[in-house]
Design a protein with these regions (language model features):
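Catalytic cores of nucleic-acid ligases and guanylyltransferases
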Residues: 1-334
Length: 334
């Protein structure tokens, strides 16, 4: 079951609200001695999260299918970067990481147990079944947690506003809807959106054209260097023409004096390594969802230009990981 994005938490009757955890979506299958962990796009995950697979293997129930989120708590907060480190080809490396920072599996749906498939049961019924399953299996479970849920929008709003920097947002699901894999008709998500003032340190031309495709964003670190942290690219054709004229006039090396833009990655195979440096004079406020590993996890959206702000004031402290409080939500469910 997938969720479509909306800007506000929906109100009215018939909704169940849940925290949107910042982790890897995972379906967990248990058939007696066999455990299989699967990502939302069908890829196996157990080799990367043996600690979670082991925890599921010793639950009292012997046959079930769960839907949930893999997370890694570090110092009382959730860190997405630690999840990405687990995707390593060496089993010895994965085991070392698992020992240092064990992962947890936060369960929010029960899809089957003991040969009974619950996909056609409405969410209201599945939640009751999951609550019973959790009471019987999770109380002494290691690394397996029960995700809270509420039908009160007031409580959902408190979660959204007070849980801190490691909660991804809120998911709202229709109580009268069955489980539909891949569909977006019965669930919506409201994500945490943050803003930061960044310096434009360069740009890339659009593929096969001499017109700007994306602006490259930077922030100053404690070392005084301008580090590349991401990009923004949602422009109209007319805006691209105007930006091309503006930033071609500012072309000057080096642009970024610290970490510089790279080439293709596992997310963007077609991206070119070529980019044009500009004088770090233009400041832009952008909206983003997450900042991990020294960069924006996804593309950003321009909020406004900031001619009133000095570029040197655009520092990394704007995006430092905020205090995480979302794990406190789990303690209230068991």
């Amino acid at each position: 079951m997938e969720a479509r994005s909306v800007e506000e938490i929906p109100t009215g009757n018939g909704w169940q609200y849940e925290p949107k955890w910042d982790g890897f979506r995972c379906i967990a299958f248990r058939d007696r001695e066999q455990v299989y962990l699967q990502s939302k796009n069908g890829q196996p995950l157990a080799r990367y999260f043996p600690d979670v697979a082991d925890a599921i293997a010793v639950l009292p129930a012997k046959q079930f299918v769960l839907d949930g989120e893999l997370v890694i708590p570090v110092g009382g907060a959730l860190f997405f970067d630690e999840l990405q480190l687990r995707l390593h080809p060496a089993a010895s490396r994965v085991q070392k990481l698992a020992k240092a920072h064990p992962a947890s599996y936060i369960v929010f749906d029960l899809l089957a147990e003991n040969g009974q498939v619950y996909l056609q049961r409405v969410l209201r019924e599945r939640r009751q079944l999951l609550e019973h399953f959790a009471r019987s299996n999770f109380r002494s479970a290691k690394n397996v947690r029960f995700s809270p849920a509420t039908t009160e929008v007031r409580i959902a709003s408190e979660w959204f506003n007070k849980a801190g920097g490691d909660l991804d947002g809120i998911i709202a699901k229709r109580l009268d809807a069955p489980y539909a894999s891949g569909e977006r008709t019965a669930a919506v998500k409201v994500k945490q959106i943050r803003t930061a003032d960044c310096v434009v340190g360069g740009f890339r031309y659009a593929s096969g054209a001499r017109i700007i495709g994306s602006l490259l964003l930077g922030l100053y670190g404690n070392d005084g260097l301008l580090h590349h942290v991401g990009f923004t690219s949602s422009f109209t054709r007319e805006q691209r023409r105007e930006l091309t004229k503006k930033f071609e006039a500012l072309k000057k090396a080096p642009g970024f004096t610290g970490n510089a833009p790279g080439g293709p990655s596992r997310w963007s195979k077609e991206r070119t390594a070529e980019w044009e440096p500009v004088e770090p004079r233009v400041v832009v406020e952008v909206a983003y969802d997450h900042f991990t590993g020294g960069r924006f996890r996804h593309g950003t959206k321009i909020v406004r230009w900031r001619p009133d702000k000095a570029p040197r004031k655009c520092t990394m402290d704007q995006v430092e990981h905020r205090e995480g409080k979302s794990l406190a939500l789990l303690r209230s469910t068991m």
